[in-house]
């Protein structure tokens, strides 16, 4: 029986996710017709389902599909993961007004990519998947200058091994990263590249976002106190899956949930056998009510359950993105 739960702080929604979700919610109320979101606004099924309720928000993976949507309006919202200039230009050519809900910390990486490309650098972009929306968007800012490098331990189509990647000019080289990677694995990957290419430029401010680091640190702090870890995340959430990997490495037993309903499977499989204390965290795109549902499940089994919250909440807010008409000049940071 679970006697004690340690809830990680921080966990769940980060400032970028809150900004993006609120942008969709406000646009759905403000616009005369339903709004369209390009890609999942954040990588969480529950969030997408809740926003879709009522028919005021549609989600597409291709902007050309907007016209085919019922009662489609002319406003499209870009997801928190960022988009390439090609997608932005396609929206403009289709006459769509846009609301860019890209996380400002992702936009910062885009800005760095454009800067270094203009200066003639080759960009080594560290990521965990060539198909991740954030990687696609960042690479799209400077496709001719960018080489994808798999973060340590990650392989796949389009990802180069940091031990073997080849570059055209080792003297004009900079490293940028996806924002949601393992802090430890990213540091090791950069160290490998720096050892191979001594002239490699590492930007002074880390690309990994504060929320990624803080959530990983919270897992490390709790792990010594628990028998097992539960991580609420979608498999599509990069930061959430990195939390799962970290929890398993630090604790030895870690399980992924999307909702409290998944606990039935764990209990039937005997996965929580012998577990008396459990740590719980959640991806930056996971609503906290899903975490509280898990706590309620265990409390129903043990009314004397002790719940301890470890760590501190963040106090960061991002400005609401503005709507841009298709004929309107883009802000300088988007050019």
Curated annotation (Swiss-Prot):
Binding site for [4Fe-4S] cluster: 14, 103, 209
Keywords assigned: 4Fe-4S, Iron, Iron-sulfur, Isoprene biosynthesis, Metal-binding, Oxidoreductase
Annotated residues for binding of (2E)-4-hydroxy-3-methylbut-2-enyl diphosphate: 43, 81, 132, 179, 237-239, 285
Single GO MF annotation: metal ion binding
InterPro entries given in the database record: LytB/IspH (IPR003451)
The name this protein goes by in its record: 4-hydroxy-3-methylbut-2-enyl diphosphate reductase
Pathway(s) it belongs to: Isoprenoid biosynthesis; dimethylallyl diphosphate biosynthesis; dimethylallyl diphosphate from (2E)-4-hydroxy-3-methylbutenyl diphosphate: step 1/1; Isoprenoid biosynthesis; isopentenyl diphosphate biosynthesis via DXP pathway; isopentenyl diphosphate from 1-deoxy-D-xylulose 5-phosphate: step 6/6
Entry keyword annotation includes Protease: no
Key word 4Fe-4S present: yes
Entry similarity comment: Belongs to the IspH family.
One of the GO BP terms on file: terpenoid biosynthetic process
EC class name: oxidoreductase
Catalysed reactions listed for this entry: isopentenyl diphosphate + 2 oxidized [2Fe-2S]-[ferredoxin] + H2O = (2E)-4-hydroxy-3-methylbut-2-enyl diphosphate + 2 reduced [2Fe-2S]-[ferredoxin] + 2 H(+); dimethylallyl diphosphate + 2 oxidized [2Fe-2S]-[ferredoxin] + H2O = (2E)-4-hydroxy-3-methylbut-2-enyl diphosphate + 2 reduced [2Fe-2S]-[ferredoxin] + 2 H(+)
The enzyme's E.C. designation: 1.17.7.4
Cofactor note: Binds 1 [4Fe-4S] cluster per subunit.
Cellular component, GO, one term: cytosol
Gene that encodes the chain: ispH
Cofactor(s), names only, from the UniProt record: [4Fe-4S] cluster
Protein species of origin: Deinococcus radiodurans (strain ATCC 13939 / DSM 20539 / JCM 16871 / CCUG 27074 / LMG 4051 / NBRC 15346 / NCIMB 9279 / VKM B-1422 / R1)
UniProt: dimethylallyl diphosphate binding residues: 43, 81, 132, 237-239, 285
Active-site positions on this chain: 134 (proton donor)
Protein role: Catalyzes the conversion of 1-hydroxy-2-methyl-2-(E)-butenyl 4-diphosphate (HMBPP) into a mixture of isopentenyl diphosphate (IPP) and dimethylallyl diphosphate (DMAPP). Acts in the terminal step of the DOXP/MEP pathway for isoprenoid precursor biosynthesis.
Binding site for isopentenyl diphosphate: 43, 81, 132, 237-239, 285
């Amino acid at each position: 029986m679970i006697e004690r739960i340690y809830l990680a702080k921080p966990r769940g929604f980060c400032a970028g996710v809150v900004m993006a979700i609120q942008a969709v919610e406000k646009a759905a109320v403000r616009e005369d017709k339903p709004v369209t979101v390009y890609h999942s606004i954040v990588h969480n099924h529950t969030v997408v389902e809740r926003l879709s309720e009522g028919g005021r928000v549609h989600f597409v993976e291709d902007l050309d599909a907007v016209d085919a949507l019922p009662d489609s309006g002319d406003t499209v919202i870009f997801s928190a993961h960022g988009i390439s200039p090609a997608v932005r230009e396609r929206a403009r050519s289709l006459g769509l007004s846009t609301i860019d809900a890209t996380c400002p910390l992702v936009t910062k990486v885009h800005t760095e990519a454009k800067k270094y490309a203009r200066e003639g650098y080759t960009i080594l972009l560290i990521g965990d998947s060539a198909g991740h929306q954030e990687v696609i968007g960042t690479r799209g800012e400077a496709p001719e200058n960018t080489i994808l490098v798999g973060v340590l331990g990650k392989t796949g189509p389009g990802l180069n091994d940091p031990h073997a990647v080849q570059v055209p000019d080792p003297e004009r080289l900079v490293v940028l990263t996806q924002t949601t990677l393992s802090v430890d694995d990213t540091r090791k990957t950069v160290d490998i590249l720096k050892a191979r290419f001594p002239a490699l430029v590492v930007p002074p401010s880390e690309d990994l976002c504060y929320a990624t680091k803080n959530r990983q640190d919270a897992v490390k702090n709790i792990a010594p106190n628990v028998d097992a870890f539960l991580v609420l995340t979608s498999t599509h959430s990069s930061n959430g899956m990195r939390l799962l990997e970290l929890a398993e490495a630090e604790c030895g037993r870690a399980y992924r949930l999307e909702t409290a309903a998944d606990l039935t499977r764990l209990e039937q499989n005997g996965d929580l056998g012998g577990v008396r204390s459990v740590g719980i965290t959640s991806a930056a795109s996971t609503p906290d009510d899903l975490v509280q549902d898990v706590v309620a499940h265990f409390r129903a089994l043990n009314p004397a359950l002790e719940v301890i919250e470890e760590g501190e909440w963040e106090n960061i807010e991002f400005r609401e993105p503005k709507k841009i008409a298709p004929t309107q000049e883009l802000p300088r940071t988007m050019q």
